[in-house]
């Protein structure tokens, strides 16, 4: 392939990705006008770039990549080798908690904007999106992140209290949970998925970083969340803690139980004809790639896991009851341990 043909191929792929992400929400004319304004060129010149009659410069590629949140390196003919390019945050010490939350919000917003999307979440623990809709649970998870994972110095000598987390963070967390409520999602859990939160709560109490009453209150809220998720699995539709059904797709919640495979919080996202994989890295972060061969491979793997799992949403009332009875039993056992602890 000549350099010129390769550049045409890459440029077409970039604009196709932008169009796929926009879906029906942006007309071709609107995209041309947006591109013309971004590159400071005429609409005719923008059309010529879209039709690949004029090549993009490196400066224009950078502007388009930043503005439309697309990565052009994934389109550079990677199929000719076995290499996969992953995007990974290496400057984590300079990443603020605001940036961390906004990154989750932005990625999720881009995914659900497309009418043809789906998320497959192979859950090592209960997906964080669920926690964020209950303020007390969101506050604890955020405190845990900032103290234990981000290791923020100002949290070194603090014990957990519900009022330590700012309203700004809780409000953004709520928005993230509302976005996820609109997503067409497939979650793969196992019996270990619920243990993580219980273990974190007990550890904080045993380490003197949380009062007993607070730990028990958190477990009560966790039971409340599990009751909500059980209801969602029953109706296969995400709903808020108050029972209101948000905007979204009917049958947009699919829950699977796999008793053998230990998951790792890997996420596969399909957005129209494009896809993205999120691979866990450094405890809290994700490496991402949109490499088609890799994404197709992961999609096939996760599809295979779901086929070998028990679907506990929808009509599977017996299996659903067995699983959630186990969950509530583990929560009560933890509360009993806390109640008699010194």
What are these regions (language model features)?
Residues 1-89:
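Basic, Lys/Arg-rich alpha-helical nucleic-acid-recognition elements, primarily the DNA-binding modules
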Residues 2-12, 40-47, 134-141, 155-172:
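Charged, low-complexity, helix/coiled-coil-prone segments
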Residues 3, 98-126, 184-214, 342:
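Short N-terminal signal/transit or membrane-insertion segments
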Residues 44-49, 77-78, 92-98, 134-140, ...:
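Short, charged low-complexity intrinsically disordered segments located at boundaries
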Residues 80-158:
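Helix-turn-helix/homeodomain-like alpha-helical modules used for DNA recognition
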Residues 145-330:
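Hydrophobic protein-protein interaction segments
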Residues 330, 334-342:
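Long, charge-rich alpha-helical interaction segments
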